[in-house]
């Protein structure tokens, strides 16, 4: 755990300030949770440092004896975590284009819109197909995406399982500033193969510290899958 925390700390950057600066292209990034890197959902703020997260994303931190802020790693009092009402108001005020159809939607409704957008669903249909990691005599289904191995989005190194991808990116691309598509997320039913993470390494360390393939029912939505996998992975530790 100590090693994981040190890797997370080394990958973190300052949380960008909320506001409309930067136009539509940067609006989602300014209102993105530093843990899941998606638009805030039921945002909460830590009283001591002021950093904001989705309520669900911060929950695991609140269940440990001495919680640390996931962004700055400073200790905080879990009783002094409150709803970020000012952020919620801004989410309802600002609009940004959908990644699929480019329709402008308020940030508060962006997640719901993306889950039903036909253009996004078309993009999801083009995700990588399943390839067995070893030769097999069994027939290979044609409609199962590859969720076993991934290619590095920075250098193209292939056939990396999830743990190998995390290790490879931490060791080889720690300082790479490029925005890239998460190959793990894009292989999921809810993934967007065209969405580039503003801080991929931070996303990788926070969002993919356990295997979806081990814990997830792929028929449920992304947030339910993440919470179920996180709970099950913690119960095995």
UniProtKB/Swiss-Prot annotation:
Positions of RING-type zinc fingers: 33-73
UniProt subcellular location: Cytoplasm
UIM domain sequence ranges: 221-237
Annotated signal peptide: none
Gene expressing this chain: Rnf166
Catalytic activity: S-ubiquitinyl-[E2 ubiquitin-conjugating enzyme]-L-cysteine + [acceptor protein]-L-lysine = [E2 ubiquitin-conjugating enzyme]-L-cysteine + N(6)-ubiquitinyl-[acceptor protein]-L-lysine
Residues at which Zn(2+) binds: 98, 101, 113, 117
UniProt-recorded name of the protein: E3 ubiquitin-protein ligase RNF166
GO CC field: cytoplasm
Enzyme Commission number(s) of this protein: 2.3.2.27
Annotated zinc fingers (C2HC RNF-type), start-end: 98-117
Top enzyme class: transferase
The organism of origin for this protein: Rattus norvegicus (Rat)
Function: E3 ubiquitin-protein ligase that promotes the ubiquitination of different substrates. In turn, participates in different biological processes including interferon production or autophagy. Plays a role in the activation of RNA virus-induced interferon-beta production by promoting the ubiquitination of TRAF3 and TRAF6. Also plays a role in the early recruitment of autophagy adapters to bacteria. Mediates 'Lys-29' and 'Lys-33'-linked ubiquitination of SQSTM1 leading to xenophagic targeting of bacteria and inhibition of their replication.
Pathway: Protein modification; protein ubiquitination
GO biological process, one term: innate immune response
GO molecular function: ubiquitin protein ligase activity; zinc ion binding
Key words of the record: Autophagy, Cytoplasm, Immunity, Innate immunity, Metal-binding, Transferase, Ubl conjugation pathway, Zinc, Zinc-finger
Primary location group: cytoplasm
SUPFAM superfamilies: RING/U-box
Origin: domain of life: Eukaryota
InterPro entries attached to this UniProt entry: Di19_Zn-bd (IPR008598), RNF_E3_ubiq-protein_ligase (IPR051438), ZF_C2HC_RNF (IPR034734), Znf-RING_euk (IPR027370), Znf_RING (IPR001841), Znf_RING/FYVE/PHD (IPR013083), Znf_RING_CS (IPR017907)
């Amino acid at each position: 755990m100590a090693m994981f925390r040190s890797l997370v700390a080394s990958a973190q950057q300052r949380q960008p300030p909320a506001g409309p600066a930067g136009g539509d292209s940067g609006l989602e990034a300014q209102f993105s949770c530093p843990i899941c890197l998606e638009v805030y959902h039921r945002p909460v703020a830590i009283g001591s440092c002021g950093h904001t997260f989705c309520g669900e994303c911060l929950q695991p931190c609140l269940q440990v004896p001495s919680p640390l802020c996931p962004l700055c790693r400073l200790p905080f009092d879990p009783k002094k975590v409150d709803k970020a009402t000012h952020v919620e108001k801004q989410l309802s005020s600002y609009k940004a284009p959908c990644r699929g159809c480019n329709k402008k939607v308020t940030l508060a409704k962006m997640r719901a819109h993306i889950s039903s957008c036909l253009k996004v669903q078309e993009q999801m249909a083009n995700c990588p197909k399943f390839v067995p990691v070893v030769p097999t005599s069994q027939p290979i289904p044609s409609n199962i995406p590859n969720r076993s191995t991934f290619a590095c989005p920075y250098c193209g190194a292939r056939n990396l399982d999830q743990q190998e991808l995390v290790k490879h990116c931490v060791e080889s691309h720690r300082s790479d500033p490029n925005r890239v598509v998460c190959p793990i997320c894009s292989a999921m039913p809810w993934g967007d193969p065209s969405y580039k993470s503003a801080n991929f390494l931070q996303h990788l360390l926070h969002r993919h510290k356990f295997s979806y393939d081990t814990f997830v029912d792929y028929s449920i939505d992304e947030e339910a899958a993440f919470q179920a996998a996180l709970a099950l992975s913690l119960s095995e530790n």
